[in-house]
Amino acid sequence: MLYLHDVWVNWFEGEENGYNVCHFYEWRKDDTIELLDQVPLLKVDATLYHYIENELLELPQQLLEDVHHKAYIRKNHERLQQEYCFVVTDGRGIIAVDTIGYNVPIRKSRLIPRQEQMVYEMVENVQAEKYKFQMEETEKEHHILSPSPHIMNGLTRKERQLKQLLFMALDQLHTTKNPAEIRYWYTEWDPSAYGAVQHMEFEDVWKQLYEEAKNGWSEKHEQLCERLVKGQPFFEKLWEMENEQKVN
Protein backbone atom coordinates (compact mmCIF):
# COMPACT_ATOMS: atom_id res chain seq x y z
CA MET A 1 0.00 0.00 0.00
CA LEU A 2 1.14 3.54 -0.80
CA TYR A 3 1.42 6.15 1.97
CA LEU A 4 1.71 9.92 2.16
CA HIS A 5 3.33 11.68 5.11
CA ASP A 6 2.90 15.16 6.61
CA VAL A 7 -0.26 15.94 4.66
CA TRP A 8 -2.07 19.23 5.36
CA VAL A 9 -5.87 18.92 5.26
CA ASN A 10 -8.74 21.38 5.56
CA TRP A 11 -11.81 19.28 6.32
CA PHE A 12 -15.23 20.16 4.89
CA GLU A 13 -17.85 18.19 6.78
CA GLY A 14 -21.04 16.65 5.41
CA GLU A 15 -20.49 17.85 1.84
CA GLU A 16 -22.15 15.64 -0.76
CA ASN A 17 -21.04 17.88 -3.63
CA GLY A 18 -17.36 18.00 -4.50
CA TYR A 19 -17.55 21.65 -5.56
CA ASN A 20 -17.94 22.61 -1.88
CA VAL A 21 -14.68 20.87 -0.93
CA CYS A 22 -12.48 23.87 -1.59
CA HIS A 23 -9.16 23.68 -3.38
CA PHE A 24 -6.07 25.03 -1.67
CA TYR A 25 -6.25 28.49 -3.28
CA GLU A 26 -9.68 28.97 -1.64
CA TRP A 27 -8.61 28.04 1.88
CA ARG A 28 -9.09 30.83 4.41
CA LYS A 29 -7.09 32.02 7.40
CA ASP A 30 -9.85 31.01 9.80
CA ASP A 31 -10.19 27.47 8.37
CA THR A 32 -8.96 24.73 10.70
CA ILE A 33 -5.96 23.07 9.08
CA GLU A 34 -4.83 19.67 10.40
CA LEU A 35 -1.73 17.58 9.78
CA LEU A 36 -1.98 13.92 8.81
CA ASP A 37 1.26 12.33 9.96
CA GLN A 38 0.61 9.29 7.76
CA VAL A 39 -2.26 8.44 5.42
CA PRO A 40 -2.83 5.58 2.94
CA LEU A 41 -3.14 6.50 -0.74
CA LEU A 42 -5.52 4.56 -3.01
CA LYS A 43 -5.91 4.67 -6.76
CA VAL A 44 -9.42 3.74 -7.92
CA ASP A 45 -11.39 3.97 -11.16
CA ALA A 46 -13.13 7.20 -12.15
CA THR A 47 -16.60 5.89 -11.26
CA LEU A 48 -15.70 5.11 -7.65
CA TYR A 49 -13.70 8.33 -7.31
CA HIS A 50 -16.69 10.40 -8.46
CA TYR A 51 -18.94 8.44 -6.08
CA ILE A 52 -16.67 9.23 -3.11
CA GLU A 53 -16.19 12.89 -4.07
CA ASN A 54 -19.84 13.66 -4.82
CA GLU A 55 -21.89 11.47 -2.50
CA LEU A 56 -22.42 10.82 1.20
CA LEU A 57 -23.11 7.14 0.70
CA GLU A 58 -21.59 3.92 2.02
CA LEU A 59 -17.99 3.25 1.06
CA PRO A 60 -17.00 -0.23 -0.18
CA GLN A 61 -16.44 -2.54 2.78
CA GLN A 62 -13.16 -3.84 1.37
CA LEU A 63 -11.84 -0.28 0.98
CA LEU A 64 -12.65 0.44 4.63
CA GLU A 65 -10.87 -2.73 5.71
CA ASP A 66 -7.82 -1.84 3.59
CA VAL A 67 -7.36 1.56 5.28
CA HIS A 68 -8.49 0.62 8.80
CA HIS A 69 -6.20 2.16 11.45
CA LYS A 70 -3.53 2.99 8.86
CA ALA A 71 -3.73 6.78 9.15
CA TYR A 72 -2.42 8.97 11.95
CA ILE A 73 -3.14 12.60 12.71
CA ARG A 74 -0.73 14.82 14.62
CA LYS A 75 -2.34 16.96 17.33
CA ASN A 76 -0.55 18.78 20.15
CA HIS A 77 2.60 16.67 19.65
CA GLU A 78 0.52 13.49 19.83
CA ARG A 79 0.19 10.91 17.04
CA LEU A 80 -3.43 9.75 17.03
CA GLN A 81 -4.61 6.72 15.08
CA GLN A 82 -7.63 7.28 12.80
CA GLU A 83 -10.37 4.73 12.17
CA TYR A 84 -10.91 5.19 8.43
CA CYS A 85 -8.91 7.98 6.81
CA PHE A 86 -7.30 7.92 3.36
CA VAL A 87 -6.42 9.86 0.22
CA VAL A 88 -8.03 8.65 -3.00
CA THR A 89 -7.41 9.48 -6.66
CA ASP A 90 -8.41 8.26 -10.09
CA GLY A 91 -5.25 9.76 -11.58
CA ARG A 92 -7.00 13.08 -12.22
CA GLY A 93 -8.95 14.22 -9.16
CA ILE A 94 -7.59 13.87 -5.62
CA ILE A 95 -9.46 14.00 -2.33
CA ALA A 96 -8.71 13.13 1.30
CA VAL A 97 -11.46 11.42 3.30
CA ASP A 98 -12.10 10.86 7.00
CA THR A 99 -15.21 8.89 7.93
CA ILE A 100 -14.80 9.75 11.66
CA GLY A 101 -15.58 6.12 12.39
CA TYR A 102 -18.62 5.75 10.12
CA ASN A 103 -18.78 4.02 6.74
CA VAL A 104 -19.54 7.16 4.71
CA PRO A 105 -17.13 9.97 3.70
CA ILE A 106 -18.20 12.49 6.35
CA ARG A 107 -15.14 14.77 6.05
CA LYS A 108 -13.39 15.64 2.80
CA SER A 109 -10.40 17.79 1.95
CA ARG A 110 -8.24 18.77 -1.00
CA LEU A 111 -4.46 18.66 -0.76
CA ILE A 112 -1.91 21.42 -1.20
CA PRO A 113 -0.45 21.59 -4.76
CA ARG A 114 2.97 20.14 -3.85
CA GLN A 115 1.32 17.09 -2.31
CA GLU A 116 -1.10 16.74 -5.23
CA GLN A 117 1.91 16.58 -7.54
CA MET A 118 3.43 13.91 -5.33
CA VAL A 119 0.22 11.86 -5.61
CA TYR A 120 0.26 12.05 -9.42
CA GLU A 121 3.87 10.87 -9.49
CA MET A 122 3.23 8.03 -7.03
CA VAL A 123 0.21 6.57 -8.87
CA GLU A 124 1.35 7.19 -12.45
CA ASN A 125 2.23 3.53 -13.13
CA VAL A 126 -0.08 1.98 -10.54
CA GLN A 127 -3.16 -0.07 -11.44
CA ALA A 128 -6.46 1.13 -9.97
CA GLU A 129 -7.80 -1.01 -7.12
CA LYS A 130 -11.10 -2.72 -7.90
CA TYR A 131 -13.74 -2.39 -5.19
CA LYS A 132 -17.31 -3.66 -5.32
CA PHE A 133 -19.89 -1.07 -4.38
CA GLN A 134 -23.59 -0.47 -4.94
CA MET A 135 -24.30 2.47 -7.21
CA GLU A 136 -27.70 4.15 -6.97
CA GLU A 137 -29.73 3.01 -9.97
CA THR A 138 -31.32 6.40 -10.39
CA GLU A 139 -29.17 9.39 -11.24
CA LYS A 140 -28.46 11.75 -8.36
CA GLU A 141 -31.15 14.40 -8.11
CA HIS A 142 -30.02 17.96 -7.70
CA HIS A 143 -32.43 20.56 -6.38
CA ILE A 144 -32.49 24.12 -5.06
CA LEU A 145 -30.78 23.17 -1.77
CA SER A 146 -28.25 20.88 -3.49
CA PRO A 147 -27.53 22.62 -6.79
CA SER A 148 -26.02 20.80 -9.74
CA PRO A 149 -22.29 21.33 -10.41
CA HIS A 150 -22.89 23.15 -13.70
CA ILE A 151 -24.79 25.87 -11.77
CA MET A 152 -21.78 26.31 -9.45
CA ASN A 153 -18.92 25.91 -11.91
CA GLY A 154 -16.65 28.92 -12.31
CA LEU A 155 -17.71 30.61 -9.06
CA THR A 156 -15.39 31.50 -6.17
CA ARG A 157 -15.92 30.05 -2.70
CA LYS A 158 -17.63 33.26 -1.55
CA GLU A 159 -19.89 33.34 -4.62
CA ARG A 160 -20.88 29.69 -4.13
CA GLN A 161 -21.72 30.32 -0.47
CA LEU A 162 -23.80 33.39 -1.31
CA LYS A 163 -25.54 31.60 -4.17
CA GLN A 164 -26.52 28.78 -1.83
CA LEU A 165 -27.77 31.38 0.65
CA LEU A 166 -29.85 33.00 -2.13
CA PHE A 167 -31.32 29.58 -2.96
CA MET A 168 -32.14 28.96 0.71
CA ALA A 169 -33.94 32.32 0.85
CA LEU A 170 -35.81 31.56 -2.41
CA ASP A 171 -36.79 28.14 -1.06
CA GLN A 172 -38.19 29.76 2.08
CA LEU A 173 -40.00 32.33 -0.07
CA HIS A 174 -41.59 29.42 -1.94
CA THR A 175 -43.19 28.15 1.29
CA THR A 176 -45.06 31.44 1.83
CA LYS A 177 -47.20 31.03 -1.31
CA ASN A 178 -47.77 34.79 -1.12
CA PRO A 179 -48.47 36.14 -4.65
CA ALA A 180 -47.97 39.81 -3.72
CA GLU A 181 -44.62 39.06 -2.07
CA ILE A 182 -43.23 37.02 -4.95
CA ARG A 183 -44.32 39.69 -7.45
CA TYR A 184 -42.51 42.29 -5.36
CA TRP A 185 -39.29 40.25 -5.34
CA TYR A 186 -39.46 39.50 -9.04
CA THR A 187 -39.87 43.22 -9.72
CA GLU A 188 -36.80 43.86 -7.53
CA TRP A 189 -34.93 41.43 -9.77
CA ASP A 190 -36.36 42.81 -13.02
CA PRO A 191 -38.10 46.21 -12.62
CA SER A 192 -39.18 46.19 -16.28
CA ALA A 193 -41.42 43.17 -15.59
CA TYR A 194 -43.66 45.01 -13.10
CA GLY A 195 -46.72 45.05 -15.35
CA ALA A 196 -46.27 41.52 -16.69
CA VAL A 197 -46.13 39.79 -13.29
CA GLN A 198 -49.22 41.45 -11.81
CA HIS A 199 -51.51 38.87 -13.37
CA MET A 200 -49.26 35.81 -13.05
CA GLU A 201 -49.79 32.98 -10.56
CA PHE A 202 -47.44 32.62 -7.58
CA GLU A 203 -45.85 29.40 -8.86
CA ASP A 204 -45.16 30.84 -12.31
CA VAL A 205 -43.49 33.97 -10.94
CA TRP A 206 -41.38 31.97 -8.46
CA LYS A 207 -40.25 29.53 -11.14
CA GLN A 208 -39.34 32.37 -13.48
CA LEU A 209 -37.32 34.11 -10.75
CA TYR A 210 -35.50 30.89 -9.87
CA GLU A 211 -34.76 30.00 -13.51
CA GLU A 212 -33.33 33.46 -14.18
CA ALA A 213 -31.34 33.66 -10.93
CA LYS A 214 -29.87 30.15 -10.96
CA ASN A 215 -27.21 30.77 -13.61
CA GLY A 216 -24.01 32.71 -12.97
CA TRP A 217 -23.35 35.25 -10.24
CA SER A 218 -23.38 39.03 -10.56
CA GLU A 219 -23.92 42.22 -8.59
CA LYS A 220 -27.62 41.82 -9.39
CA HIS A 221 -27.65 38.38 -7.70
CA GLU A 222 -25.81 39.79 -4.69
CA GLN A 223 -28.27 42.67 -4.28
CA LEU A 224 -31.27 40.33 -4.44
CA CYS A 225 -29.67 38.01 -1.89
CA GLU A 226 -28.88 40.88 0.50
CA ARG A 227 -32.44 42.20 0.34
CA LEU A 228 -34.07 38.77 0.68
CA VAL A 229 -32.16 37.87 3.85
CA LYS A 230 -32.75 41.19 5.61
CA GLY A 231 -34.73 40.73 8.83
CA GLN A 232 -34.06 36.98 9.02
CA PRO A 233 -31.42 36.50 11.75
CA PHE A 234 -30.08 33.11 10.61
CA PHE A 235 -29.74 34.14 6.98
CA GLU A 236 -28.36 37.56 7.96
CA LYS A 237 -25.63 35.86 10.03
CA LEU A 238 -24.59 33.73 7.06
CA TRP A 239 -24.56 36.83 4.87
CA GLU A 240 -22.38 38.73 7.33
CA MET A 241 -19.95 35.81 7.68
CA GLU A 242 -19.37 35.69 3.92
CA ASN A 243 -19.09 39.44 3.56
CA GLU A 244 -16.38 39.62 6.20
CA GLN A 245 -14.25 37.68 3.70
CA LYS A 246 -12.13 40.01 1.60
CA VAL A 247 -11.15 37.28 -0.89
CA ASN A 248 -12.31 33.84 -2.09
From Swiss-Prot:
Highest rank taxon of the organism: Bacteria
Pfam families tied to this protein: DUF3603
InterPro entries listed in its UniProt record: UPF0736 (IPR020909)
Family the entry assigns: Belongs to the UPF0736 family.
HAMAP family in alphabetical order: UPF0736
Protein's name in the database: UPF0736 protein Bcer98_0893
